[in-house]
Swiss-Prot record:
Disulfide bonds: none
Gene: bcsABII-A
GO molecular function, one term: cellulose synthase (UDP-forming) activity
Taxonomy, superkingdom: Bacteria
Alphabetically ordered keywords of this record: Cell inner membrane, Cell membrane, Cellulose biosynthesis, Glycosyltransferase, Membrane, Transferase, Transmembrane, Transmembrane helix
Metabolic or biological pathway: Glycan metabolism; bacterial cellulose biosynthesis
Region of interest (Catalytic subdomain A), ranges: 144-237
Region listing for Catalytic, in residue ranges: 1-731
Comment text on domains: There are two conserved domains in the globular part of the catalytic subunit: the N-terminal domain (domain A) contains the conserved DXD motif and is possibly involved in catalysis and substrate binding. The C-terminal domain (domain B) contains the QXXRW motif and is present only in processive glycosyl transferases. It could be involved in the processivity function of the enzyme, possibly required for holding the growing glycan chain in the active site.
Domain PilZ residue range list: 569-668
CDD domains: CESA_CelA_like (cd06421)
Record-given protein name: Putative cellulose synthase 2
Cellular compartment(s): Cell inner membrane
Pfam families: BcsB (PF03170), Cellulose_synt (PF03552), Glycos_transf_2 (PF00535), PilZ (PF07238)
Length: 1518
């Protein structure tokens, strides 16, 4: 949309019609920037951010297909918005300062990212609107054309290199009397002087070589007088039209001090020449000269680049000449002129061409000089300071200077994953999902937008290779120059060198080779960590993420190393591919017309059908004429090869005139370099493929090359020393062009000079193709480990017979709690144990322990063993057999008298591997007890003791870990009072059971065996059938089973039954040691929201000691068993932008010389998610003494730990694991093992920064903590709707649900309201509502209660209802947090509920702040199964969204309903929440901001562009 408007003028027309075109352009810019900043700072959930990212990326891909500067500006704004969101997220959500090392590494990475973002912004600024200046016409009257001095400075270059440049300059298409070409020879070589005389060029030397090139130029300015000076490096040969196409701007704008043209290189740079895919990639310098300089021209900030430029003498002399303070005199000179108010310009037409650096090491040396110079400018003459520059110019210079600071950030990005893989420091504290949805869009937008901007000038991912090739060399230069800016000298870059054979330049790549080795080691470490080390999910993801990061770094480094594989360079005259019409005349006068394939200063290849082999060795004349360029060539050449219609010729240059003609043909054509940008537009995937191809070239074996002797390559023998001129100031004036031929002919001493022209300048015939070797990049496997075979299922042979006879059960150690694998005992951790539970109503008559495992074969048999005890009573010993380290099965009989209710089965390891001294931490000290070891118990029931004081026994055994069943007898299941009383009793049992599984099977008669609870009106209270005399509790024998007990809760009325139930659950300690008792009512205090005993208070800090006993926070040994702190929270706690809650933890370790506190640590985890590790080292001496005076925690080590809200649920557990190390006490010194470590019970949890606010419906809140019903501990704001006549299955589900509520709140459900379905129509339920029953039982009440649910249950199917009007639109455009859940609309939900349970959540139709949760299904049994799932931790993750379907063991979750909220927030936080939870609104606001900013910027840039060129539209597309 934006692109179409920007390119077609629709926006301009619309603004003109509405009058908005008169609004200043800064208004939409400011509005857009403010809106972008606001949107960029909003924090949203990673899943929602993912949708926003998908939207922005999709828009990017769509708009990127359209052309136009307007679209480009909009995409830049969009990229900046995405990057802003990323950097705000990095700064506010991913930074944790856990220790000094992590802090340093995290800050370093943040600084590198800030640098990268600044560079991105500056790049967009520079390249937002390339000016695309065209040539300005010269005056028609040539008499007005100015005189021009052409300077060719030289120091130590070869004469063969300088000759072409001088001859090309002498051949410039400019009036001869106004063209003065000078060789500025700081080498004072006589050969150069003689060449200048022969060619008719001027020659200038000076007495002292002060200030290198800048001093040379300043000296030349002092001895010449033309108003304009043109500078060419000695290898830059101009086209004939150079002056005609450039001087026009200098004449048209008298304030123009400089006009720069591109530095084009006709020879490939090291990256093109050495990389396998390099020749298909634009040269490294193309982006600067093709795009950056053009963008600088827009801002009047063109840089002088030292060559191929025109300088106004007045301007440069006005600043005291060329700058000499830095080694980059060119850029500094331009800066000084711009400070004085002079303008600069850039013409993006390559009008000269030179040689690129042939070898990587030379390229690095050149870039090191550039980096030093730019940093010197930043330190000595910072463009951001001082007067004379506009802010736009300052930013352009800031971009140039800061670019050469890339070394440290680039290295930081490459090695950052090593912090985690080698040092264990997580420097980006975020989940992989969050990193993906924030970082990847930032990178993607940057890459694609830059790809669009840079197009054919620079391919994606190649900047990384260029920078990495230099980074390690520049690190030292960067730091040294920043600290000592005056250091450093000007170094001349060698060019025109030859290589006899290819080789690997270790000097140029050895730092990257070392870095690659380190990255390979990190890669192996990452793979090892992923495959062979045990991690929780986040740790595993961190390993994967950092390993992928290493792979990316390694790809970049390998590509940069591949540049060091230098290829053979046997031609000192590189070929230029060009098709020119030529005429070849042989010795017999036969003329052959053809076209060149390539040409060079050494020769050419001509395609002609008349080429015959007999021409080889003969001499021909090559003619080329171009009237347009004023070039006429007729030069002899020798035929080297003639076949396949191609003549390969070597120039046979006879004199200087022939050489001039060759130079003119090769370099002088005005369109010689017009194809400098003829590269395919960038496509990132293709560019990436080229990177891999280049890496493959590094790994591919190169065919053997026979080295060529120098004379074979045409390199003549050079004299050992060159003849020098005297050190003095000397000026030889150039000879006018008209007088040159006579002067040259009369100079007999130069007749032999042409013999010095190297024979190797001829074009060599190409060697036969020897590339018949194919190479295939090896892609090995991922080093994933072999998955071990699954252990065979072992039948535990459980014989669970319910009778008076003996019952035998076999339990594996896995059944006893060894769920993580074998019990491992070590020297520093010699004790491991398990709990063996015997039911309270049974005694053990026989027990046998069967063990298997292994003992270290390195142990001494006579001094090593594992001792087995039960309740500190000896059971047996496992002895060491070095020949057979594995043992078992070994059986031990256990005396039944050793058993109690809860029994401790312990294994104590004592091991020695040498007779004198043993290191407890030596890895050979180990023993393992298999988790498939087992214990077999034979038990019998004992006669029950029926006393109310023993309640909840025998119905509940606290030592039991298996599922508990409490049968409930309800003679009248439809009695509301009895249901409330039974629900109250069930919730009491649920509170007692807590985390244990518990169910209440309901019947109308007493079961045939076992225990039961009977609730009802006027029930028998003794064996004789006596009736209650009031509210009464009684324990009586099961009439069907003398071993069973029935607890009777009864009364004469329904009200008395409820009184009896309240007395049972609220005052069981007052019942006494009697079998029956008439009880009185209990008065209850009014409950308040969130005061459930299970919930940690959120209005004050909570001591650990309030949650667990001090003994639970203590452990013995150097590596004691993990300590846990369970706690419950209301799941609706909300913090601003997910700020973490705080835990103030104090740990205590033994004093004295026992534990090495510096290396010992305690690991803290939350819900099995690792949080942090802390040293046990005490505080400093001053702090230690001050704490003794004022701190209750004196002697303890304190730490503050952040508890992320996303790791907190309804039920939580903090884990503390100590890992201590003993102090080295020397040889044969016993290390005390009976040490104790603890977490101080006065440590606190603080949740005060949380607000009670939640998005609903959310069944996970209900499954975790019965929310929102648990908001009131007694369920006084909860109504349960049951069928009017519930059957036993539905009633059992109701009681199970009450038990679940009691376990969630730790408070009986004394205030719950129970009503029938038929009552709903005339008495609307209050508060939050639970609906329980099948669709058939509930009738029409279900549809009314679920009126705001999107689901409809009809004809034994559940579907998404048909919503009309605005409600339907809301369903279509609502924002979802799916979290992987299905949407009922998009999934076209139409599921049968036969044999299925249905759990539904919806907003209450009676109160928008209330909720409805419905349990329904096809049969009561399915409902009952669904309620039982709430007690199964394995099923809790499946209970999410607003709809759960349970078919057998399979759960399917949906989220379809619109979100509503419960709770309250301050106004400011509510606004933040709204934007953070509506990604579509955030997305549209972001697009609006980017669009406004882009519109204003586009209009501003367009106007500035026209102003920049002084109203002369010569710039092409605007």
């Amino acid at each position: 949309m934006y692109g179409t408007w920007f390119t077609t003028g629709k926006v301009t027309d619309l603004l003109a019609r509405t009058g908005l075109d008169r609004v200043p352009v800064w208004v939409p810019v400011v509005l857009g920037v403010v809106l972008m900043a606001f949107v960029g700072s909003v924090r949203i959930d990673p899943a929602l951010q993912g949708w926003v990212s998908v939207g922005t990326v999709t828009l990017l891909l769509v708009l990127n297909r359209r052309r136009g500067r307007g679209i480009t500006v909009f995409l830049m704004m969009l990229s900046l918005l995405v990057s802003l969101r990323y950097i705000v997220w990095r700064l506010t959500a991913t930074v944790q300062f856990s220790n000094w090392l992590q802090t340093a590494l995290a800050v370093l990475l943040l600084l590198a990212e800030a640098y990268a973002l600044m560079t991105l912004c500056l790049s967009y600024f520079q390249m937002a609107w390339p000016l695309r200046r065209r040539e300005h016409p010269l005056p028609e009257d040539m008499a007005q054309w100015p005189s021009v001095d052409v300077f060719v400075p030289s120091y130590n270059e070869e004469l063969s290199l300088v000759r072409s440049t001088v001859l090309g300059a002498l051949d410039l298409d400019w009036p001869a009397d106004r063209l003065n070409v000078y060789i500025l020879d700081d080498g004072r070589r006589k050969a150069f002087h003689d060449f200048a005389v022969e060619a008719g060029a001027g020659y200038i030397i000076r007495a002292e070589n002060n200030h290198a090139k800048a001093g040379n130029l300043n000296h030349a300015l002092a001895v010449t007088d033309s108003p304009f000076a043109v500078i060419f490096d000695c290898d830059h040969v101009p086209t004939r039209g150079f002056l005609r196409r450039t001087i026009g701007w200098m004449m048209a704008d008298p304030n123009l001090a400089l006009l720069q043209t591109p530095h084009h290189f006709y020879a490939p740079d090291p990256f093109q020449r050495n990389l396998a895919g390099g020749m298909h990639v634009p040269p490294e310098g193309n982006m600067f000269y093709g795009l950056v300089q053009d963008g600088n021209d827009f801002w009047d900030a063109t840089f002088f680049c030292g060559s191929c430029a025109i300088i106004r003498r007045e301007a440069v002399m006005g600043i005291g000449g060329f700058a000499t303070e830095t080694v980059t005199e060119d850029a500094h000179t331009a800066l000084k002129m711009q400070r004085r108010g002079w303008g600069t310009a850039y013409l993006r037409e390559p009008l000269a061409a030179g040689l690129a650096t042939e070898r990587l090491i030379l390229h690095i040396g050149q870039r090191v000089r550039w980096a030093r110079g730019m940093i010197q400018i930043m330190r000595l003459d910072n463009p951001m300071l001082g007067a004379g520059l506009r802010w736009e110019q300052r930013l352009c210079y800031l971009s140039a200077m800061s670019h050469f600071l890339f070394a440290i950030p680039r290295l930081t990005f490459l090695v950052s994953p090593l912090a985690f893989l080698f040092l264990g420091q997580n420097i980006i504290a975020a989940s992989p999902l969050a990193i993906s949805v924030y970082a990847l869009p930032h990178i993607f937008h940057s890459v694609i937008t830059l790809s669009r901007i840079e197009g054919r000038w620079r391919y994606s991912f190649w900047s990384e290779i260029y920078e990495t090739s230099l980074a390690l060399f520049l690190v030292r230069i960067t730091i040294v120059t920043l600290l000592q800016p005056h250091k450093g000298k000007f170094n001349v870059t060698d060019k025109g060198g030859l290589l006899a054979r290819g080789y690997f330049d270790w000097d140029a790549v050895y730092p990257n080779v070392i870095l690659a080795g380190v990255l390979c080691a990190a890669l192996l470490r990452g793979v090892f960590g992923i495959v062979w080390q045990f991690h929780d999910r986040l740790a595993l993801q961190s390993f994967i993420l950092n390993t992928l990061w290493v792979v990316i770094s390694l790809i970049i480094v390998l590509a940069s190393i591949a540049v060091g594989r230098e290829t053979r360079q046997t031609r000192n005259a590189p070929r230029v591919s060009v098709r020119l019409p030529v005429v070849v005349t042989d010795a017999h006068g036969r003329q052959m017309e053809g076209h060149t394939h390539d040409i060079s200063l050494g020769g050419l290849a001509v395609g002609t059908r008349l080429a015959t082999p007999d021409m080889v060795g003969g001499e021909v004349t090559v003619r080329y004429d171009s009237a347009r360029d004023g070039i006429h060539v007729g030069v002899p050449a020798r035929v080297l090869d003639a076949r396949d219609g191609t003549l390969r010729l070597r120039w046979a240059v006879r004199d200087l005139e022939d050489e001039r003609q060759v130079v003119s043909m090769v370099f002088g054509r005005n369109d010689a370099w017009a194809g400098w940008a003829d590269f395919a537009p960038d496509r990132p995937l293709r560019s990436l493929a080229m990177v891999f191809r280049s890496i493959g070239g590094l790994l591919r074996r190169r065919p053997a090359e026979a080295p060529r002797a120098l004379h074979e390559m045409g390199e003549g023998e050079l004299p050992a020393t060159e003849e020098k001129l005297e050190k003095q100031s000397f000026v030889l004036k150039p000879v006018p062009r008209s007088a040159r031929h006579g002067a040259t002919a009369s100079a007999a001493l130069f007749v032999a000079f042409t013999a010095l022209v190297p024979a190797a300048m001829a074009q060599e015939a190409p060697s036969p193709d020897q590339s018949g070797v194919t190479a295939e990049t090896p892609f090995g496997d991922s080093n994933t480990g072999v998955v071990p075979d699954a252990l065979p299922a072992i039948d535990p042979a459980v014989a669970d017979r319910i009778s008076d006879a003996e019952v035998t059960r076999t339990l594996t150690f896995r059944n006893l709690g060894a769920t993580t694998g074998p019990l491992t005992l070590r020297g520093y951790s010699p004790l491991q144990g398990l709990d063996v539970v015997v039911p309270a109503n049974r005694v053990v008559t026989h027990a046998q322990l069967t063990l298997s495992g292994a003992l270290s074969p390195s142990l001494l048999p006579e001094a090593s063993a594992v001792t087995v005890t039960l309740n500190e009573q000896y059971v047996g010993t496992l002895k060491v057999d070095p020949q057979h380290p594995q043992f078992g099965p070994v059986s031990f009989d256990i005396d039944p008298l050793y058993f109690t209710g809860d029994n401790k089965l312990n294994f104590h390891f004592a091991g020695e591997y040498r007779r004198d001294c043993n290191d407890l931490f030596n890895e050979i000290l180990w023993a393992r007890i298999s988790d498939m070891s087992r214990i077999t118990l034979t038990t019998v029931r004992i006669t029950p003791e029926r006393k109310l004081s023993r309640l909840p026994a025998p119905f509940f055994d606290p030592n039991q870990r298996s599922t508990l069943r409490v049968p409930v007898v309800l003679p009248a299941t439809g009695d509301r009072g009895a249901l409330r009383a039974a629900g109250l009793v069930a919730s009491w049992f649920g509170r007692i059971a807590d985390f244990r599984k518990l169910s209440f099977p309901v019947s109308t008669t007493i079961p045939a065996s076992g225990n039961a609870v009977e609730v009802g009106v006027n029930l028998p209270v003794d064996a004789e059938g006596g009736r209650p005399a009031g509210p009464m509790l009684a324990e009586v024998a099961n009439p069907n089973d003398r071993w069973g007990t029935v607890l009777v809760v009864t009364g004469r009325t329904a009200q008395e039954v409820e009184v009896a139930a309240r007395a049972l659950v609220f005052s069981p300690d007052t019942l006494g040691g009697v079998a029956s008792k008439v009880v009185s009512d209990v008065s209850l205090e009014t409950r308040h929201p969130y005061d459930a005993p299970a919930f940690v208070p959120t209005d004050r800090p909570v001591r650990f000691g309030e949650l667990v006993g001090a003994a639970d926070l203590q452990g013995g040994g150097f590596a004691p068993a993990g300590m846990t702190l369970p706690f419950h929270l209301p799941p609706d706690l909300y913090t601003w932008r997910g700020r973490p809650f705080l835990m103030n933890m104090w740990v205590r370790a033994p004093g004295g010389p026992v534990v090495d506190l510096e290396t010992s640590r305690v690991d803290v985890s939350l819900n099995n998610n690792y949080l942090q590790s802390y040293t046990l080292s005490p505080p400093g001496l001053w702090r230690k003494w001050s704490e003794r005076l004022v701190n209750q925690h004196a002697g303890a080590v304190g730490h503050v730990t952040a508890l992320p809200p996303w790791l907190l649920f309804g039920q939580n557990q903090l884990q503390f694991n100590f890992d201590a190390r003993p102090i080295d006490r020397g040889a044969c010194r016993r290390t005390p093992g009976d040490i104790h470590m603890s977490v101080d019970s006065d440590s606190t949890l603080d949740f005060r920064r949380g607000y009670h606010f939640a998005e609903m419906p959310n069944l996970s809140y209900f499954a975790e903590a019965a929310f929102p019903f648990s908001r009131m501990a007694d369920l006084s704001e909860t109504t349960v709707v049951l069928p009017d006549h519930p059957d036993t299955g539905t009633t059992g589900a109701f009681l199970d649900l009450m038990g679940f509520f009691g376990a969630s709140t730790w408070y009986p459900a004394a205030g719950v309201t129970v009503m029938g379905a038929d009552e709903v129509a005339h008495t609307p339920p209050k508060g939050d509502i639970v609906v329980l029953g099948t669709a058939a039982q509930l009738g029409g009440a279900a549809s009314g209660l679920l009126a705001r649910s999107p689901y409809v249950i009809h004809d034994r199917h559940i579907t998404v209802g048909q919503r009309m009007g605005l409600q339907g639109i809301w369903y279509l455009f609502q924002d979802h947090d799916h979290a992987g859940l299905k949407d009922g609309v998009t999934a076209n939900l139409n599921a049968p509920i036969a044999e299925a349970g249905v759990l539904l959540a919806a907003q209450s139709p009676y109160d928008s702040q209330r909720s409805v949760v419905a349990f329904t299904g096809d049969t009561p049994e399915r409902i009952h199964d669904l309620v039982l799932s709430l007690r199964n931790k394995g099923d809790l993750p499946s209970l999410q969204g607003d709809l759960v379907l349970k078919n057998g063991d399979r759960f399917t979750s949906y989220r379809t309903a619109p979100v509503y909220t419960v709770g309250s927030l301050p106004l400011w936080l509510r606004l933040d929440w709204f934007l953070g939870h509506h990604p579509s609104a955030l997305y549209l606001a972001g697009l609006a901001g980017a669009g406004l900013a882009a519109l204003g910027v586009w209009a501003w840039l367009r106007g500035w562009s026209r102003k920049r060129i002084a109203r002369d539209d010569l710039t092409g597309e605007l």
